[in-house]
């Protein structure tokens, strides 16, 4: 899947979030590529502040193009964890992490930055700030027993 396809799928999800007034930001490899060295990725990571009362409409608005399981979404909200949705045609996965109540996560949401993602300057999405991408990558590196060069290379790419 090439970058325009990745952004096309990501934008579909984000437009639904915006329609439902769900605060979000893109993190992970897509964010580190936006601020540093581009690299291939197999998914999009989005942090979102989804509330239980938004799940029904979220499922309704996504189910024609994505596989989405409302029970998984409710469980992710309950346990402040994650769930994924898969684009039916492109088979591209979007991992959605529920915003945790940790001070860092709440601050990261307030520090998110909007960037243009295509030649059409109206196509803008919120990304985690470069500093928050670095901190998140270092946290994932530590949780992964400090063996993933990908996380460190992403950090170095942003710092350059």
Where do the PLM segments sit?
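Compositionally biased terminal segments of proteins
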Residues: 1-160
């Amino acid at each position: 899947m090439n970058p325009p396809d990745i952004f096309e799928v990501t934008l579909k999800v984000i437009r639904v979030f915006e329609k439902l007034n769900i605060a979000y930001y893109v993190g992970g490899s897509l964010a580190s590529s936006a601020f540093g060295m581009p690299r291939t990725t197999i998914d999009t990571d989005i942090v979102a502040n989804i509330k239980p009362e938004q799940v029904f409409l979220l499922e309704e608005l996504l189910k024609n193009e994505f596989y989405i399981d409302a029970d998984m979404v409710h469980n992710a909200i309950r346990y402040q964890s994650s769930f994924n949705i898969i684009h039916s045609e492109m088979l591209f996965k979007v991992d959605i992490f529920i915003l945790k109540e940790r001070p860092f996560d709440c601050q990261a949401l307030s520090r998110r930055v909007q960037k243009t993602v295509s030649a059409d300057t109206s196509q803008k999405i919120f990304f985690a700030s470069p500093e928050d991408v670095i901190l998140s990558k270092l946290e994932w590196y530590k949780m992964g027993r400090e063996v993933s060069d990908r996380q460190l290379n992403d950090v170095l790419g942003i710092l350059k």
